[in-house]
C-alpha cells in the first residue's frame, strides 16, 4: 500500500479497515521474508551468524532511488541483529545507512558468488540483463520477478 493511499484515508477521519489490514500485512512482510530466508539457510545447513546476504534493490519501488519507507531497511536491520553481513546491489541507490551504519554496496557482478544467499527485493529493470541462472548461489525472490527462474519465492 503506498504512502499516498494511507494519507488519503487519514483525511477522511474514519478508519478504513481494508486499508488498515493492508498496512498490517505490509508491516509484517520484512519479518516474514527474514524468517523464510532463515528457514532456507537452515535447510542448506548454513548458520545465519556471519553469513553473507546480497540484497538486489533497496529502493521503495522499481527504477527509483528513494529508500524512504522501503521494507529493505527493516530487513537489513533484522539481519544486522542476527550477525548477518549484508550488502546491497542497486543501480539507483549510491549509499545506504541503516542503524547508523553504512551498508556495503556491491558494485561488481563478478562478486555475486561470494555470498551465501541472494535476495531479490526491488526488481529494477536493469536486473533483467543479469543471467541469474549462471550464479551458483541460492536466491530468494520476494518479488515474483520474471527474470529469475530457479529461486525460492514468497
What are these regions (language model features)?
Residues 4-154:
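Structural/interface elements that position substrates and couple domains in central-metabolism enzymes
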Amino acid at each position: 500500500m503506498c504512502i499516498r493511499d494511507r494519507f488519503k484515508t487519514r483525511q477522511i477521519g474514519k478508519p478504513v479497515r481494508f486499508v488498515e489490514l493492508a498496512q498490517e500485512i505490509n508491516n509484517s512482510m520484512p519479518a516474514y521474508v527474514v524468517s523464510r530466508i532463515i528457514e532456507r539457510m537452515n535447510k542448506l545447513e548454513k548458520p545465519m551468524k556471519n553469513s553473507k546476504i546480497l540484497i538486489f534493490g533497496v529502493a521503495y519501488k522499481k527504477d527509483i532511488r528513494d529508500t524512504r519507507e522501503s521494507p529493505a531497511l527493516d530487513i537489513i536491520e533484522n539481519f544486522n541483529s542476527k550477525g548477518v553481513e549484508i550488502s546491497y546491489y542497486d543501480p539507483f541507490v549510491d549509499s545506504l545507512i541503516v542503524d547508523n551504519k553504512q551498508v556495503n554496496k556491491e558494485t561488481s557482478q563478478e562478486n555475486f558468488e561470494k555470498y551465501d544467499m541472494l535476495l531479490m527485493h526491488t526488481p529494477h529493470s536493469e536486473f533483467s540483463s543479469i543471467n541469474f541462472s549462471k550464479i551458483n548461489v541460492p536466491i530468494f525472490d520476494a518479488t515474483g520477478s520474471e527474470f529469475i527462474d530457479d529461486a525460492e519465492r514468497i
